[in-house]
Amino acid sequence: MPILEADIALTDFFLFAITLILGLKLQKRKNLRKPRERWVFLLLFYTVSLSSLAGGIAHGFYSNAPESTIFRILWLIIFVNVGFATYSMTHVAAKSLNNMKLLWLLSVFLMPFFIYALLGGNNFLYCALIALFGQIIFLFTSIYEFRRGNLAWKAALLGCLATCLGMIVQVVHIGFENFGPSAIFHMIQAAGMLYYFSFAKQYLGQYST
């Protein structure tokens, strides 16, 4: 079976592999100073990984059949995982700012978003808006914490800026003939996830052995 949207699908699969490896590496780290907070970062890496896998399959093999059951299931997986990834980032920001009301605010957006996805909605604009909410919260938290002298947040800030740059590429529709905006976004997002991994390691800490 030929790949339909090769640039998008292959870069989605690349992002899937990168985030899966990062999640597994983080899961295996021992002697963490904050072991109870590891789950929220694992949630980020594994949900991005799963949504990328679903996206690669959808774009690569079912983009010509958007009304098919398989395509709808794949998009449901993407939507739900984007929601959980946004939750994970907002959770870290809220805990850092000691303001868990941010999670309540997020839930106001997430509940109708999940209901929309479960009812078969597949307008990616809603998905992008949810992701943007998490990025904005995380961006301002990163700037605030870094300016306070928390150097671990430099990696978080760079990861957030990379992801926002990727979003701009998609919105402005910057791309090449055989390598479109979505493919470029996936590559930039992969770089952003590497920065998030660096941040996660510093945030969780590790006792010397």
Region spans (language model):
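Polytopic alpha-helical membrane-helix bundles and their juxtamembrane interface segments
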Residues: 1-47, 56-209
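Conserved phosphate-interacting/catalytic interface
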Residues: 53
